[in-house]
């Protein structure tokens, strides 16, 4: 830990004295932390080896691999490129729509390259149809969710990377369900293709005037605008605006960095130029983590200009041990050091996510401590995004009071740490941050 702090270039400041700290809530209130045989918080970093894998899909392969497979099938390699155009640019897997392919080859190509991955079970709309939560059934019956949001000048998709989550965070509905399995590269990518298909069909409505005004009030630094630099300038909504997903946030179900290889392959498929991939901007992609420190440093070294978000939720280990069980493995300062390493390596500003929980982590001294720790490592490298805690089933915890949230933000901004309260799109349909649980009822 000390070595990591030295590498980051600054020591962590001392915490306030114990006398200056109000007691946190009793550890047993609301939940009991599951522990392993050694008494450590029970975490799932990997899926069972007995889990059946999804069928291989075009999106699992590079263009060269698709061409090679087509040739193995006795089909000219350029047909794989044509098929890629249909999937990544026309968002279709229907052979009837692929009229540029010989009729004798269409069914065979679709069967081999485009097996069905996500079957829509249900969609729920809110925000006058500008937000849609999808429930998908995967090939093995596992359920995942994604949330599509149209803002006035961008379209954002919150995607899942795992079926469930093994991080066991008590205030997150996904974390309380445990980990079923990792999603494949193609299952991750197919969420975007399916969303683009919905947009192309005109099934995602425009935001209403109030939402446009509220986003303008945030100066482009609300829910996801801050994550895609250069794409968050407020303007009036135009029907001629974006007609496909431009922003991706890995903030759905799962811990993305616990499924590192498949998530990174999915990111590459997103940014690969069409028809090899979706041709998206890497700057519009955000990966969030609860703090898997070695993976954060590995991500920094990937040389991809994506945005990184650290779900911190408490600046002190006393509380973070309770809220974020992985803090037992890597402490708060180690996670912040890794986030700072990401900034120094990539030049990309880091986001700190912080769910404000009433009487738990919203104390003024915690805002001050957070500011001290961030400023000790430098200025201009980080933006804090507090968000009111979203309700989850059976939780006794609630969101902070508005005046408490305002004071928390005031202290951070006053200390020179750029801070903006995040939007809570999708809360009414359990589609907001921490609410995704993939339940059919």
Model-found features: residue ranges?
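Phosphate/nucleotide-binding beta-alpha loop and adjacent structural elements of enzyme active sites
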Residues: 430
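Conserved AdoMet/S-adenosylmethionine-binding subsite of the radical SAM
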Residues: 199-205, 235-420
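Flexible, acidic/Gly-rich N-terminal and inter-domain linker regions that tether
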Residues: 1-155, 208-236
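C-terminal catalytic core of tyrosine-transesterase DNA break-rejoin enzymes
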Residues: 437
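Short linear Ser/Thr-Pro motifs
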Residues: 126, 160-161, 288, 311
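Acidic carboxylate-rich catalytic motifs and surrounding loops in phosphoryl-/glycosyl-chemistry enzymes
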Residues: 422-427
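Canonical Radical SAM [4Fe-4S] cluster-binding loop centered on the CxxxCxxC motif
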Residues: 150-201, 209-210, 214, 218-233
């Amino acid at each position: 830990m000390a070595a990591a702090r030295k590498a980051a270039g600054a020591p962590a400041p001392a915490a306030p004295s114990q006398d200056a700290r109000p007691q946190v809530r009793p550890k047993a209130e609301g939940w009991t932390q599951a522990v392993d045989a050694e008494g450590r918080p029970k975490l799932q970093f990997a899926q069972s080896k007995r889990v059946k894998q999804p069928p291989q899909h075009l999106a699992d392969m590079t263009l060269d691999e698709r061409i090679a497979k087509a040739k193995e099938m006795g089909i000219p390699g350029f047909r794989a490129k044509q098929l890629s155009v249909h999937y990544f640019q026309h968002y279709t897997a229907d052979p009837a729509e692929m009229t540029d392919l010989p009729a004798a080859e269409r069914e065979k190509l679709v069967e081999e390259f485009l097996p069905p991955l996500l079957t829509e079970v249900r969609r729920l709309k809110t925000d006058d149809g500008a937000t849609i939560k999808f429930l998908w059934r995967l090939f093995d019956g596992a359920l995942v969710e994604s949330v599509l949001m149209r803002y006035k000048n961008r379209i954002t998709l919150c995607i899942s990377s795992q079926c469930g989550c093994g991080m066991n965070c008590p205030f997150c509905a996904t974390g309380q369900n445990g980990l079923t399995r990792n999603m494949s590269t193609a299952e991750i990518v197919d969420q975007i293709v399916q969303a683009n298909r919905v947009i192309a069909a005109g099934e995602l409505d425009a935001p209403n005037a109030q939402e446009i005004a509220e986003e303008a009030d945030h100066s482009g630094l609300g829910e996801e605008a801050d994550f895609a630099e250069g794409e968050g300038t407020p303007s009036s909504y135009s029907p001629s605006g974006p007609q496909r997903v431009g922003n991706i946030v890995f903030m759905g179900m799962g811990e993305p960095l616990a499924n590192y290889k498949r998530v990174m392959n999915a990111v590459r498929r997103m940014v690969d130029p069409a028809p090899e991939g979706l041709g998206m901007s890497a700057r519009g992609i955000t990966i969030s983590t609860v703090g898997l420190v070695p993976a954060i440093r590995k991500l920094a070294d990937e040389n991809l200009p994506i945005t990184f978000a650290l779900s911190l939720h408490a600046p002190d280990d006393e509380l973070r041990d309770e809220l974020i069980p992985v803090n037992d493995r890597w402490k708060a300062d180690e996670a912040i050091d890794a986030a700072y390493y990401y900034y120094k390596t990539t030049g990309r500003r880091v986001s700190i996510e912080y769910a404000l929980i009433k009487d738990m982590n919203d104390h003024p001294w915690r805002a001050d401590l957070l500011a001290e720790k961030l400023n000790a490592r430098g200025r201009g490298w980080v933006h804090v995004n507090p968000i009111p805690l979203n309700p989850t089933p059976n939780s006794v915890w609630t969101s902070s009071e508005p005046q408490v949230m305002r004071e928390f933000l005031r202290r951070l901004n006053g200390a020179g740490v750029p801070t903006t309260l995040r939007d809570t799109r999708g809360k009414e349909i359990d589609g907001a941050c921490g609410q995704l649980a993939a339940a059919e009822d």
